[in-house]
Each structure stands twice: as C-alpha cells, then as structure tokens.
C-alpha cells in the first residue's frame, strides 16, 4: 500500500483516481474492545455478538467509503493488536489524522496509560496536529457514580503522566469520551470524532440552525443513514436521550428501506416539482398528521439535474413522522431523507408539524439545496466525495 508523505485530514484523489482515505488508528490494550467498536459501528454487528470476536493478531485496515460501507468521509480504520508499538505499526504516525485509543474502564490503568503516552510522544514530533480521542470503554458496566469517578481519574492520570514526560505534550489535543457498544454513546462519540474531519461542518451547522429557528425545532441532526453517525447538528446542546431517540427511529426506518427502494425504482410514479420551490411562508394545513405515519415525498430538486442537461432519474426522498406523546407531549419526531445517504431528524412542536406542514417541507427543500451546494463545492475543491 502506498502511503502519502504528508499528514492530511482530507482525503485526496491519487493520480489513478482512487480516493485516499482519512486514516484513523484504533489502539488500546488487549481485549479493550477495539474490534467490537469497529464492527458495531460499521458492520452492524449486534453488540452481544462481539463476545465471539477473535483476538486481532496483526494490523488490519478496514476501508469505508460513500459507495459500499457508507460513511460521510472515506475512512481507513486501522485495527491494531494490543501489543502494537510505534515501531511495529508499519506506518509513520504522520499518516494518521486521528488516533482512537480505547481503555477498558475497569482495567488497571497503568498499562493503557503508558501505551497512550508512548503514542502521544511518538506523534508529537511528526504530527502535532493529530487528534487523540480516548474512548473510556465498556462504561455501561459501572454504576453512574463509579463511571464518572473512573472517567475523571483516567483523565487526571493521563494528564499527569504527559506533564511528567514533557510539558510540551500538554499541547497535544486529547479528548475523552465515555463509550459502550450497548448504547448509543459509541455512535455519539465517533460522530464527534468525525466532526473534526469535516471542513464544511460550520456551514452545515449554520443550515441546521436556520432550519431550527424557521420551524421552532428544539433539535435537529443530520445523520449518515448507513453508519447512523450524525454528521452535524444545530448549536443547541446534544442530550443523550434525544440522540438515542433519533438513532432508534433511524434504525427502525432503515429496516423498512427496502420497501422504499422498490418504490423508487418505479419511475413513472415520480413527479417533478417546479424547479424553484416557492416558499409558502404562512402555509397552514388543517389535515392532522397521523402518529407514527410514514409518508412518501417524491421530489426532484434543481440540483438533481446533472449539469449536462441530460435528465437524470428522479430521486426518491421518503419522509416520516412520529408523535412523541406521552413521553414528550406536544413534540413530533420527523425524518426527511435529504440526499441518498443523509437524513434530517428533527424534533418539532406538533402544532408546527400539523398546522404549518408546508413551511416545514419548504425548509427541508431549502436545507437539501444548501447541503447539495456544499457538497458540490467540496467536490470541486478536493475532487473527492465527502457526502453522497
Ligand atoms: N461490557 C462490554 N463489553 C464489551 C464492550 N465492547 C467490547 N466488549 C467485550 O470485550 C471483549 C473484547 O472485545 P474485542 O473487540 O475483541 O477487543 P479487542 O481490543 O479488539 O481485543 P484484541 O484484538 O485481543 O486486542 C469482548 O468479549 C467484547 O464482547 C462494551 O462496550 N461493553
């Protein structure tokens, strides 16, 4: 495998047209849960099945891109055995954008911390900009108080050890996350890891902020539908319960995806909307939304047309909504696919969803346009695909 000479947080296209993926190193001591993390996140392995995973004996590269194993950034995830060292890794640390270091929350921390410090020291000279993400893993094993206490202790010890080694290492960016394959904390943590690799993140966040303020939405996420990682969210804080709710809803809808696909394949049913969507700013709809209803929206935006002018097959964008009563009275969870691989999940006041449906849909079309424009700019700039 040919490796680039310089660190890069962006995938580039090599001369032969193949995409250089963003490299992420998955490190940690034996049995800390590295392979489980990779398998649960990207191969949909049920968490309980991780029990049967074989130990990793040599460095294994897993490729994820927009076509097959979809993720928003073409990734190359290096799953390493527990005994790997900087010298035996087989690639310079300058090749990696991010190191995800996994620590079993119930472990004796001495050994994992020494290994982490070894890699921080190894990376410092060659790639000081590398992101170190420490996953304090298997968190669900402990009670809430113990979990927080262990999390704090690990952070403290790592910081102390780094300061003992050299004051310079304090400059290395280290981020700590509590994770478990048994809940959505892993997806949330890995989403945050990816956010640092998305150049256009602030523009996407800006679009989501506008969507939220126009529709009175308290929270909106843009999810990658395959990996179930969120690409961006609006600027209000993420609370775990809302994130979990959105992940579960997305997972449930994805299980119905084959039904939508077969519809999408039947072209004559697709109606093109007018090329410029007309905003219905005061649109009110008296038709109440049925709870837990899934409704197909067939739309074709101007950017669906290739620039050559040749009519491309219209895309199918399903949408769905579910009332969150009684747990969240007066709130509706909505889902809108905005590109073939990205979906908007938003909480909306039920009154807005039911009474101002036109306004909501216009804002979805507007968001879709914005995301496609960003995608086009990204594509032109780096001639590579971050979003599909
Ligand atoms: N309770 C709990 N167990 C987990 C979690 N993640 C992984 N495990 C378990 O941890 C054990 C080791 O998982 P692996 O993914 O094989 O760990 P690894 O770090 O890849 O191991 P090596 O390849 O030997 O270095 C398995 O029995 C998993 O089921 C978690 O979040 N919670």
Question: What spans do the regions from the language model cover?
Answer:
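Short hydrophobic/glycine-rich mini-motifs in sensory/regulatory modules
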Residues: 337-345
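Switch I (effector-binding) loop of TRAFAC-class P-loop GTPase G-domains
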Residues: 42-72, 84
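Short, flexible boundary segments at extreme N-termini or domain junctions of P-loop NTPases and their
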Residues: 1-29, 62-66, 163-166, 179, ...
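Canonical P-loop GTPase G-domain recognition
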Residues: 130-132, 140-219, 238-242, 248, ...
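A charged amphipathic helix-loop-strand protein-protein interaction module that recurs
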Residues: 204, 237-333
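Glycine-rich phosphate-binding P-loop
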Residues: 22-45
